[in-house]
């Protein structure tokens, strides 16, 4: 789930069991192959969608061999290969939270039915297109373990829009088109980037705790387990003990 803490999300994904990790890898492989086909190239230097898909896969520790093989298969795929369409869905969760879902699907009817079923069974409600999308904006996010002033200066000088400091390090936000300029500048200056990818951030957050928080996390988990769902974003501000 994408929401309050990007560091908590990385910790949760790295701690996923084998079954969940395998499903997560499969989603990334699908995204990489779809990016190759839609962008018409297996070279990330000339295909920004592919570059973003690879960055997301690396953040979730997808092995380099898996990524390379996915690109090769997509480049060599013939006309009979499955065509996946990017589709977004919106809804509401416990505590008045907004939920924005990104999918890659070869069957829109199946996908919307699956998502609606999860909302109905897990205490949420599906919304119309545009009902909550306005509460999110696309941003580049870089996580850096080094929280020094020098690192922050490099980020700011190269286009960072906002920097949040925590015990884990820095969470740097950029305009989507500036993500790689900031990331490359940090790497060139000798800073080890934990992750860098395009994501959706809430413009405002809603504090959710207790039973509502637990119900929301369950709803998001079931949405994330759907094969066609790539990312689930919420505007929830969760207590740290609920995020872990």
From Swiss-Prot:
> Which InterPro entries does this chain map to?
Integrase-like_N (IPR017856), TACO1_YebC-like_2nd/3rd_dom (IPR048300), TACO1_YebC_N (IPR049083), Transcrip_reg_TACO1-like (IPR002876), Transcrip_reg_TACO1-like_dom3 (IPR026564), YebC-like (IPR029072)
Gene Ontology annotations for the cellular component aspect, listed alphabetically = cytosol
What keywords are assigned to this protein?
Answer: Cytoplasm, DNA-binding, Transcription, Transcription regulation
Q: Which GO terms describe its biological process?
A: regulation of DNA-templated transcription
Q: Which GO terms describe its molecular function?
A: DNA binding
Record keyword Flavoprotein present:
no
Q: Where in the cell is it found?
A: Cytoplasm
User: Main location per UniProt?
Assistant: cytoplasm
In terms of superkingdom, the source organism counts as Bacteria
For region Disordered, the annotated ranges are 1-23
Keyword match Metal-binding: no
**Similarity annotation:** Belongs to the TACO1 family.
Q: What is this protein called?
A: Probable transcriptional regulatory protein DR_2548
Q: To which species is this protein native?
A: Deinococcus radiodurans (strain ATCC 13939 / DSM 20539 / JCM 16871 / CCUG 27074 / LMG 4051 / NBRC 15346 / NCIMB 9279 / VKM B-1422 / R1)
């Amino acid at each position: 789930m994408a929401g309050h803490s990007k560091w908590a999300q990385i910790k949760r994904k790295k701690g996923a069991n084998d079954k969940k990790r395998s499903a997560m890898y499969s989603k990334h492989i699908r995204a990489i192959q779809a990016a190759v086909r839609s962008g018409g190239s297996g070279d990330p230097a000339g295909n920004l969608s592919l570059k973003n898909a690879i960055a997301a896969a690396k953040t979730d520790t997808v092995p380099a061999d898996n990524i390379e093989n996915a690109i090769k298969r997509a480049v060599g795929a013939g006309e009979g290969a499955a065509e996946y369409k990017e589709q977004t869905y919106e809804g509401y969760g416990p505590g008045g939270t907004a939920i924005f879902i990104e999918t890659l699907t070869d069957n829109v009817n199946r996908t919307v039915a699956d998502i609606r079923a999860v909302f109905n069974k897990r205490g949420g409600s599906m919304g119309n297109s545009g009902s909550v999308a306005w509460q999110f904006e696309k941003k580049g996010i870089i996580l850096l373990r080094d929280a020094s002033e020098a690192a922050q200066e490099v980020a700011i000088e190269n286009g960072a829009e906002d920097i949040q400091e925590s015990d884990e390090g820095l969470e740097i936000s950029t305009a989507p088109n500036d993500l790689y300029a900031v990331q490359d500048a940090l790497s060139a200056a000798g800073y080890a980037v934990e992750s860098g990818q395009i994501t959706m951030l809430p413009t405002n957050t809603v504090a959710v705790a207790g039973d509502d928080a637990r119900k929301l996390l369950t709803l998001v988990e079931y949405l994330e387990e759907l094969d066609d769902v790539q990312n689930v974003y919420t505007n929830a501000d969760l207590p740290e003990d609920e995020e872990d």
